C-alpha cells in the first residue's frame, strides 16, 4: 500500500468555492485538501497526503520531479486547463514513473470541445470526472490503497 500520496491542483483551482459555483460547487480547495489529509490520517498506518497548487506550469513540473525524491508513491492530479495543453506536465509524470489518477470536478466531456482532449488520460491509471469534489475522495482512497 502506498504511504505517500501527492495531490496536485493546477491553474484557477485556488478559486474553488467562489469560481463558477454552479459548475464547481462551493467547497474550497483548502477544504478539499483538509478532507484528503483527514482521509489519509484515518488509515492509521502512517499514510500521508501532501498537497500542492500552482497556477504556473513550470512549478507543477518541478513539484512532480520533487515527488520522486520525496518518495511519493502515487499522484492525484487535477491539472485544470493544463490538462488540455501541457506536454511538459505529461512528460514530467512519465519521467518520474509515479502512477497517477487524473481528476476533474466537472464532466469535461459535457463541456466545450477543446476540453475533450487530455494529454494525461492515456497514461493515467484512471480518470475520474464529473463526480464533483467527491472525485477527489474516490481518487485519494484508490491511491492510498494502491
UniProtKB/Swiss-Prot annotation:
It is an enzyme of class 4 (lyase). InterPro entries: DHquinase_II (IPR001874), DHquinase_II_CS (IPR018509), DHquinase_II_sf (IPR036441). It holds the Pfam family DHquinase_II. Pathway: Aromatic compound metabolism; 3,4-dihydroxybenzoate biosynthesis; 3,4-dihydroxybenzoate from 3-dehydroquinate: step 1/2. The record marks 19 as: Transition state stabilizer. The active site is at 24 (proton acceptor), 104 (proton donor). Its EC number is 4.2.1.10. Is involved in the catabolism of quinate. Allows the utilization of quinate as carbon source via the beta-ketoadipate pathway. Belongs to the type-II 3-dehydroquinase family. Homododecamer. Adopts a ring-like structure, composed of an arrangement of two hexameric rings stacked on top of one another. This is Catabolic 3-dehydroquinase. It comes from Meyerozyma guilliermondii (strain ATCC 6260 / CBS 566 / DSM 6381 / JCM 1539 / NBRC 10279 / NRRL Y-324) (Yeast). The lineage of its organism: Eukaryota, Fungi, Dikarya, Ascomycota, Saccharomycotina. The gene is DQD1.
Amino acid at each position: 500500500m502506498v504511504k505517500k500520496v501527492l495531490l496536485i491542483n493546477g491553474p484557477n483551482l485556488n478559486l474553488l468555492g467562489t469560481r463558477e459555483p454552479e459548475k464547481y460547487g462551493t467547497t474550497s480547495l483548502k477544504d478539499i485538501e483538509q478532507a484528503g489529509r483527514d482521509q489519509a490520517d484515518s488509515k492509521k498506518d502512517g499514510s500521508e497526503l501532501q498537497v500542492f497548487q500552482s497556477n504556473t506550469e513550470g512549478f507543477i513540473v518541478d513539484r512532480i520531479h520533487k515527488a520522486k525524491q520525496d518518495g511519493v508513491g502515487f499522484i492525484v492530479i487535477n491539472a485544470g486547463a493544463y490538462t488540455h495543453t501541457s506536454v511538459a506536465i505529461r512528460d514530467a509524470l512519465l519521467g518520474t514513473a509515479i502512477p497517477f489518477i487524473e481528476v476533474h470536478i466537472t464532466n469535461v466531456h459535457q463541456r466545450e470541445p477543446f476540453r475533450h482532449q487530455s494529454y494525461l488520460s492515456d497514461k493515467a491509471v484512471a480518470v475520474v470526472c464529473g463526480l464533483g469534489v467527491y472525485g477527489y475522495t474516490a481518487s485519494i482512497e484508490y491511491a492510498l490503497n494502491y
